[in-house]
C-alpha cells in the first residue's frame, strides 16, 4: 500500500509512529511547497541551475504530487478510519488483499492544481530551461542525444529542471550517488564510463540502521 506511511518529524520513539493517510501527507506537502514557491528562484536566477532546487522544480513537484493525489491507486480496505472523510470512486476491490483500486471523489480539484503548477513550470516560471530541439554539432545532428551528451561532458543540459550530480572525478567530503555501488572507478574503458551507465544503491542502513519494529524502515530505501 504505497503511500500510507508514518509521517511527521516530532516523534522520537518507534512506538510513537503510526500510519498516516497518503492523502493527508500529499495535502500537507503540497501546501508547504505552495507557501515556499513564490520566494524561490527560477532556474537561471541567482546563479542556480538544475543542480539546485528551484521554483521551476517546485512547480513541477507540486503538479506531480497533485496528479498522484487525484489519480487512481490502490487503497487499503482493512483500516476504514485511515482515510478520514475522504470519499472515493472505486473501480474494483480485492477482498483477499484487502484493497481497492480507486480515486478520491474530489479528484478534479487536484487535477486543477496540477494543471496550474505544471503550466507555470513550462511557461512563466520555466526560467532558462528549454527543450533541446537542435544540435550545433554538424557531424551528429541528433538533438535527442545532445541532451545526454551534456552529462557526458560534465555539463548541465538546458532541459534539466533538477537532478543530483552523479559524475566522475568530483572530489567532496559528502557522499553523492557516484559513491554508492559502483562496479568500477569510472575509467573510459570500464563501465560505467562517466555517468548513468549503472547507478545502484547499497542500502546498508536499511538492514542495520533501524529497529525491526520501526515502521519507517520499509519506506526508507528501494532494495
Regions found by a protein language model. Give the residues of each.
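Short helix/strand-bridging catalytic loops that position acidic/His residues to coordinate divalent metals
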Residues: 10-18, 47, 94-104
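An aromatic- and glycine-enriched ligand-binding surface/loop that stacks and positions planar moieties
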Residues: 5, 26, 34-35, 52-59, ...
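Conserved, well-structured interaction surfaces
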Residues: 1, 12-55
Amino acid at each position: 500500500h504505497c503511500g500510507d506511511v508514518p509521517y511527521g518529524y516530532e516523534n522520537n520513539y518507534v512506538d510513537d509512529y503510526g500510519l498516516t493517510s497518503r492523502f493527508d501527507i500529499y495535502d500537507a506537502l503540497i501546501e508547504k511547497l505552495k507557501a515556499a514557491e513564490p520566494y524561490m528562484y527560477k532556474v537561471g536566477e541567482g546563479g542556480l541551475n538544475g543542480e539546485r532546487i528551484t521554483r521551476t522544480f517546485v512547480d513541477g513537484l507540486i503538479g506531480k504530487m497533485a496528479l498522484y493525489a487525484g489519480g487512481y491507486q490502490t487503497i487499503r480496505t482493512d483500516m476504514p478510519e485511515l482515510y478520514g472523510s475522504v470519499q472515493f470512486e472505486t473501480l474494483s476491490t480485492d477482498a483477499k488483499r484487502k484493497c481497492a483500486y480507486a480515486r478520491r471523489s474530489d479528484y478534479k480539484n487536484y487535477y486543477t492544481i496540477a494543471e496550474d503548477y505544471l503550466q507555470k513550470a513550462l511557461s512563466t516560471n520555466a526560467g532558462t530551461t528549454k527543450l533541446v530541439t537542435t544540435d550545433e554539432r554538424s557531424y551528429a545532428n541528433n538533438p535527442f542525444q545532445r541532451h545526454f551528451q551534456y552529462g557526458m561532458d560534465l555539463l548541465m543540459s538546458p532541459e534539466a529542471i533538477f537532478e543530483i550530480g552523479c559524475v566522475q572525478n568530483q572530489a567532496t567530503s559528502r557522499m553523492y550517488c557516484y559513491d554508492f555501488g559502483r562496479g568500477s572507478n569510472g575509467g573510459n574503458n570500464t563501465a560505467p564510463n562517466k555517468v548513468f551507465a549503472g547507478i545502484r544503491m547499497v542500502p546498508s542502513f536499511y538492514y542495520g540502521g533501524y529497529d525491526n519494529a520501526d515502521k519507517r524502515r520499509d519506506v526508507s530505501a528501494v532494495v
